[in-house]
A protein has these predicted regions:
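Conserved N-terminal catalytic core of the sugar/cofactor nucleotidyltransferase
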Residues: 1-46, 130
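Active-site-adjacent loop/tail segments of enzyme domains
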Residues: 22-25, 55-59, 64
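Conserved core of the sugar-phosphate nucleotidyltransferase
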Residues: 46, 59-135
Length: 135
């Protein structure tokens, strides 16, 4: 990660890099911990972007990170996706096929995922415990 930190610093961007820690089993708790850290450092405002990434896909390019940040700034959130190559089958009752969506319109979400941190915090704070437990 050090090379990415130096790379973004040279571009004059204002990035806060906190301690990199092992995530919690629940994504929502991990993200809220990161947002709380940013807030405790006095760096949480309307323009703060949080980028989440998992260790399953350790090799992320500068281009993907830059695009995530740019689109999160513009649209409020950005998900890295790849086209689905397998057929996706929906089963609402877990026994019968309910729907087979058109593959050409399906994508698989990956990481990084990027968000306006304050907006994401507000969404999480308005979720029920049951909703948070499922995230």
């Amino acid at each position: 990660m050090k090379s990415l930190i130096v790379y973004f610093s040279r571009r004059g961007e204002n990035y806060v890099v906190g301690n990199i820690k092992e995530g919690n089993a629940k994504q929502a708790k991990t993200i809220m911990n990161a947002i709380s850290y940013i807030e405790s450092e006095g760096k949480l405002d309307e323009d703060t972007i949080i980028v989440t990434h998992d260790s399953v896909r350790p090799f992320v390019t500068h281009r993907i990170l830059e695009e995530n940040i740019r689109y999160a700034k513009e649209f409020g959130a950005c998900d890295t996706v790849i086209p689905a190559t397998d057929t996706i089958v929906e089963s609402k009752d877990h026994q019968n096929i309910s729907c087979i969506p058109e593959r050409s319109t399906m994508y698989l979400g990956q990481t990084p995922q990027s968000f306006k941190a304050k907006k994401l915090r507000d969404i999480y704070l308005n979720m029920t415990e049951e909703e948070l437990a499922s995230k």
